[in-house]
Every structure is written in structure tokens, then in C-alpha cells.
Amino acid sequence: MPDAVGAIDQGTTSTRFIVFDRRGTILAQAQREHEQIFPRPGWVEHDPREIWRNTHAVMREGLARAGLAPEDLAAIGITNQRETAVLWDRRTGEPLHDAIVWQDTRTDRSVAALARDGGRDRFRAVTGLPLASYFSASKLAWLLDHVEGARAKAEDGTALFGTIDSWLVWNLTGGPDGGLHVTDVTNASRTQLMSLATLDWDEAMLGVFRIPRAVLPTIVSSSAVLGEARDPFPGVPLGGILGDQQAALFGQTCFSAGEAKNTYGTGCFALMNTGPAPVASSAGLITTVAYRLDGRPPAYALEGSIAITGALVQWLRDNLGLIGASSEIEGLARSVEDNGGVYVVPAFSGLYAPHWRDDARGLIIGLTRYANRGHIARACLEATAYQTREVLEAMERDSGCPIAELRCDGGMTVNDLLMQFQADILDRPTLRPKVSETTALGAAYAAGLATGFWKTLEDLRDNWAVDKRWHPHIQAEERRALFAGWSRAVERSFGWVEENA
């Protein structure tokens, strides 16, 4: 009987394969990085062939390290960087162009032109998303318009489009020899082409971006047996697909409305389960699909993205030289009792949710002769917590549903000082799970549920365990004063970049 599940975690900088047992414990993993390609300023690309080669390699390496054979796997799940666009030839399996990565801004002008007629929110009621080059639709439109012969191939079904999950599934299940062309609802919801109401491609959106329906994958559930892998693990069921942030929500077992997680990395991604109906946002958030289990209604989510959190620590290290390694920031921040009145607003390229101010720029404010390196370090950590509070308060306003606690994952959660301050400024507990790889775990859970390796969502909840829990310690007046100072600092960051300057 199979006693493990494998998860492919295909991220922006690397690809991993992680093997989990029935308790959700990691048995083994393997990882390979891939090249970041920057053809022009603002352009970011990946080589889809390199990503597939790396995926193939880490699957074999990870399984070998676990001491298992393919027949020991009950299923394979996939989680992936979202929005990144791939276009390939179904006959040869060759990409028609390098993948255009979610960070890429080459379509800013075309998106701005669309926004002039109806504003950036003109399609939010259908897709849940503001108009932005971030999402896949404008990237696919660019590929069809700029790659020779691409539009004709798309119209006759010779060319196939997908986000990275689609590319991997197609190759895993045979490629040119009968490979499946599918994507799940979470990834489809990030293209700006899917209706949140029907969970199908929206004809009006296809018309706006001039996308032939023949090029698009079939939209499937996040947890369902899609088929069997052929290479490198013949016969192993492919049972689940989730975009990376939705996978983290699933891995944190946030299955009920009002349950939320925040992933702390270079930036932060906070998601809140809002239940079986989409919740429109008037507070600067994105409405998206959280997941859909096979044969059941979908769960929806509100999402808030924060551009700069962990990257601020890197900036202290690399640009200012205040620390020699990122791990040193906690010790430096603990060298002072508080922030000394100092605030850092990391608006290096504007502010994301909930403000969405392109004209904001970073600032350090509140400096006096008393302030020292420790105060600046502490203010940098606190900036992450303040921004997270802004997003969670927006979620509560939009949904009308209180968030009782925040489940935290990602690299920054090793910083106990940050986690304590997060609890303090939120006035609610923050929790770090024992299994830190929640994104890959979410993909494994989705796949294992589909094949019966785990029977119910309650089985997954039983697996979830707390590594550490932080409760708020500061008084209400101190909390109010700290956040008021942050709010004043944020306001002063606005308007620094003048229009047409």
C-alpha cells in the first residue's frame, strides 16, 4: 500500500520535490534553481524547458532520498508560481517563447490603455482582479501579438497556453503524446480571463484581450484525479493543483470562513477564506478562488499582497551594511527596548495592498539624535507587522468576518521578535506550524485527498500542529499609539513621485 505523497513546488527561483508521509511530515526533498532572464528593463523571463528538466530531476532525486519507489507514492500534487505565462507547440512540445514571469511589466502600457476606458476596476466584478500587468491575460496577448506565427497557431489549436502548472501537467502526462492540457481554478482565477461566478473562461474577457479559446486549458478542480504520470513516475496518479498562495492556505488547513494565513517572504501574501461565495473588495484586496475539491462548491478568498517585507532586511544588509547576514537583524533589533519613535515605510516601488499607491516612496522618519542602528532595525521588522495589520483589517471590513488568529509561514517566521510584535499589533494570537513547508504540504494534501490517502478535511486538521504560539502582551493604548505613528508615516510617503515627472 502506498505510504507517501509527493509534491512539486515550482517557484519563482527554484523547483522542489518534497515527499510527505501520512502525518504530513517531510521524508525527503530535492531542489534546483533556474536562471532568471532579464532581456530588457522591466522584463523577466524563465526558460520553460529548464523548469521541466529541473522538475524531472528533483522528482527522481527526492524520491531516491526518501528511499522509495514510484509505486510507494499514492499521488503527486503540484503547486506553482502563479500568473507566469507559457505558450508552446502541442506537436513538438517546444515553447514558442520564454515564459513571461508574473513580475514582468512589459505590458504596463497596454494595460493602462485598457484602464483609460472604465478604470482599473472595470473587470473586477467578473474576475475579482484589478487591471494589472501582474496577471496572465496581458502577457498571453503580448505573446500572441509579438511571436511570429503564434496567433495563427493559437487559433487553430496548434499552440497551447498555460500557467506553469499546465506546462508541468502536460509534460508529466505525455507531452506531445497525449499530454493533458488543464489548469485548476486557483491558477485560472489569476489569469484575468476566468469568471468567478461560472469558474469558466469568460467570453467577454477573451474578447477584450483577443484570446482564442482554443489556446486555453480546461479548468479543473484543485483536488481531483486528473490522470496518471508517465514520466518520470509511470502510473502514479496526478491528484491536485494549487497556485502557491492558495496551496499555503490549504496547507495551513484554513478550511472555514474567517481563517487566514500570511506567508512572510521577500514580500507577504495574506489570504483569508471567505467561504462558498466570492466577496467583493472595496478596500484594495483581490477576490480569488481559495480551492475547489472535486464534486464540491468552491471556496473563495480575499488576498492582500505586500511588496516589501523580507526584502527590507536584505536592503539593510546589502545596501546599508547595518547587518552582515539577515539572521542578525533580530539580535540588533533586541538591543533596544522599542523603536525609539522611528518608522520605516518600505515603499521602494510604491505601496501594494491596501493602498495601491504608485506615487509612494520609501522613508525613514522620526529620527532624533537618540536613534541608533537598533532602532532602525526594529522599525524595519515592525514595518512588516504594521503592513500585515492593514491587510487583515481590510479583510475584516470587506467580509464582515472577524479573524480570530493568524497562521504564519515563510522564512521570516523564524524571527520570534517579529512574531511577538505581530501578535501585539494585531491584538490576536499568531501561530507558526511545526511543518514550515506549507505550500508544498497544501499541494500534497490536495492530491492525497483526491486519491483517498487522506479521507476528510478533518484528517488534515488533525495533522496540523503548532510549533509556537504568540499572544499579545502590550496594552491597548500603546498599540493605538504605535499604529497611529505608522499611519502618519505612510501618509507622508504618498505623492513623492509626481505624475509626468
UniProtKB/Swiss-Prot annotation:
HAMAP family reported in the protein's UniProt record: Glycerol_kin (MF_00186)
Biological process, per Gene Ontology: glycerol catabolic process; glycerol metabolic process; glycerol-3-phosphate metabolic process
Catalytic activity: glycerol + ATP = sn-glycerol 3-phosphate + ADP + H(+)
UniProt-annotated binding residues for sn-glycerol 3-phosphate: T12, R82, E83, Y134, D244
Species for this entry: Methylorubrum extorquens (strain PA1)
Gene3D superfamilies on file: 3.30.420.40
GO molecular function ontology, one term from the record: glycerol kinase activity
Family assignment from sequence similarity: Belongs to the FGGY kinase family.
InterPro entries membership: ATPase_NBD, Carb_kinase_FGGY, Carb_kinase_FGGY_CS, FGGY_C, FGGY_N, Glycerol_kin
Protein's pathway: Polyol metabolism; glycerol degradation via glycerol kinase pathway; sn-glycerol 3-phosphate from glycerol: step 1/1
Purpose: Key enzyme in the regulation of glycerol uptake and metabolism. Catalyzes the phosphorylation of glycerol to yield sn-glycerol 3-phosphate.
EC number annotated for this UniProt entry: 2.7.1.30
CDD domains cross-referenced by the UniProt entry: ASKHA_NBD_FGGY_GK (cd07769)
Pfam families: FGGY_C (PF02782), FGGY_N (PF00370)
SUPFAM superfamilies registered for this protein in UniProt: Actin-like ATPase domain
Name this protein carries in UniProt: Glycerol kinase
Residues reported to bind glycerol: R82, E83, Y134, D244, Q245
Gene name tied to this protein: glpK
Residues given in the record as ATP binding sites: T12, T13, S14, T266, G310, Q314, G411
Keyword annotations: ATP-binding, Glycerol metabolism, Kinase, Nucleotide-binding, Transferase
